[in-house]
Regions:
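Acidic, surface-exposed loops and disordered segments
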Residues: 2-193
Length: 193
């Protein structure tokens, strides 16, 4: 698969882009990551794919249930099938690979766990210059049939990964200012500066 054994002792990972090679700390990774739906044809190395999947494996889950399972989709015809099975992710057919994140709905926190694992995969990918985007809208029965998803698991989130077809550096995020989002001690109390 993607290398059953991986090294866990690296503190910093290298990010490879067309423009530069740089170490990113967690905050920089969060601050510079964009959702990208337009991918180039450049292949992602098996080592980088392994790191992305290893990040998923290492993510914490509620009560340490580790109830999630992952279907890796790489073949072009299956990526196209995945795009057809979506209601909002037609762009995934252009991804280098995609991950169908399956969770067990018997755990009330399964959606939170799905978000946690996807964020870890996306940030790990971006650390290597690999962009990504997710979608949740699917034709459930069709997706289950096409990818043999068992009835006890939900296809909760699908993430497509690839190198961006366009330049990603220098873009600015459109985010609300912190003082419109955060309150001090009680809702409505402005943050003290």
């Amino acid at each position: 698969m993607y290398g059953a054994s991986t090294q866990h002792n690296s503190i910093y990972f290298m990010r490879h882009t067309r423009l530069s090679i740089a170490n990113m700390d967690a905050f920089e990774c969060i601050a510079t990551k964009f959702d990208i739906r337009d991918f180039s044809s450049q292949d992602i190395s098996p080592e980088t794919k392994s790191k992305i999947l290893e990040a998923a494996r290492l993510t914490g889950s509620g009560l340490n249930t580790q109830h999630w399972r992952f279907v890796i989709v790489e073949k072009k015809e299956n990526l196209e099938k995945l795009a057809e099975d979506s209601t909002s992710g037609g762009w995934v057919s252009g991804a280098n690979f995609a991950v169908i994140v399956l969770t067990n709905p018997r755990y009330k926190f399964h959606m939170i766990d799905a978000g946690r694992v996807v964020q870890d995969m996306q940030l790990t990918a971006w650390n290597y210059g690999v962009t990504s985007c997710l979608f949740t809208g699917v034709q459930d029965e069709k997706l289950r049939s096409d990818f043999s998803i068992p009835k006890e698991l939900n296809p909760t989130i699908i993430v497509g990964f690839g190198f961006s077809a366009k330049r990603t550096s220098g873009k600015r995020k459109n985010r609300m200012p912190l003082d419109e989002l955060v309150y001090y001690e009680k809702y409505g109390n402005p943050v003290r500066r």
